[in-house]
Amino acid sequence: MKALFVANLDLSETEGIYKKVNAQAEAIGKAVGSCDIVTRKGKNARIKSCETGMVTESKDAFLDYVLKQINNTDVEFLYIRHMIPSFKLIKVLKAAKKKGIKLYYEIPTYPYFGEQIKVSKKKYRAIAKVSIDIFFWPLIYKYITKLVVIRSSSKAKHYSKMIEITNGVKTEGIISKDYSLSDTEPKKVFRMVAVGTLYPYHGYDRILKGLRSCNEKIGDVAVEFHVVGSSFTIDDLKAAADNMGLKHIVFHGVKTTEELNALYDMFDVGLGCLALHRRNADIDTTLKIIEYYCRGVPVITSGQSPLKDERFTLTVADNEEAVDIKQIYDFYTHLNQESLAQLSIIAKNQFSWINIMQHLING
């Protein structure tokens, strides 16, 4: 079976979202036979074969190319990542349904109206986008076979065509933390880490407040907060850390997967979303916590975790108060090291995109 994965993105292959959709497309290809991923290069279509890795650029506009593939080739499966709807998109969906193509439409964060408006610096643009979504939604739902969602709120409405999945990762290349290297001597430094693009709803200002409250130590143990990535939120964190006089905050900048592999052995816990209420959510859907788990690092979050095994997650209060750093430290020190050594295996089995997509498509 031939599949197309369609994502209205014009991004570098090094960016996190592109890596995610590429991993999803590769997993679909393994599940159904073959898959091409269609993204944008400017206004035109950019096509990558998941089997060969070959990249080509079409002279056709993004959705025009997709429409031609539907009408003129033997595409049998179409997976579309949510984009700002248009009449051209509806034309694509209608053509796919007419040809009997199985059509899965993904909303990567559901519901997303509140998040779009809250995290946007230009509220009027976000409101305009949401209004367009509302206008086109009945037509989108009419033509799709399944609605694939990663749910961020337990209160979200459920539709009959809806299938829930979790975020996943391409597990190949992710090296697990080596717990055989753990020092048997009493710990001298406890290290927390936050990786990736950060937004205000990650709530790491609460960690800074907590570190100030405990003077960056628990008893005789120094506490460090490591931040990997770049964003305007990280710039705000740097300024806040300086204003608070914090000395144990380490900003690493952007790192490759290989560089992260070398760093992870020193991290004790990974921080997910600590202020989910800022995006009207109560489920942590971030990719960062999936990667923490798959690397064998336990997670701190203010919401529900997708990991089925609850031993490796600490849920803190979802508010604006300082996070209790001692609570995090106590959680970590009470974890069994032998169990932690199994965390990566458990997580990679649950969060492998190959496993997620095979289950989604084949049931």
PLM features per residue range, with description:
Residues 129-180:
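Donor nucleotide-sugar binding/catalytic pocket of nucleotide-sugar-dependent glycosyltransferases
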Residues 16, 320-323, 333-363:
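A charged, aromatic-enriched C-terminal amphipathic alpha-helix characteristic of glycosyltransferases
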Residues 14-15, 19, 202, 258-263, ...:
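Nucleotide-sugar-dependent
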Residues 235-262, 269:
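Nucleotide-activated donor-binding/catalytic signature segment of Leloir-type glycosyltransferases, i.e.
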Residues 87, 94-98, 105-115, 124-147:
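Membrane-proximal helix-turn-helix segments that form the acceptor-binding/catalytic region
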Residues 4-6, 183-202, 208-211, 225-226:
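Conserved donor-binding/catalytic core segment of Leloir-type glycosyltransferases
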Residues 195, 223-237, 253:
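Glycosyltransferase donor-sugar binding loop
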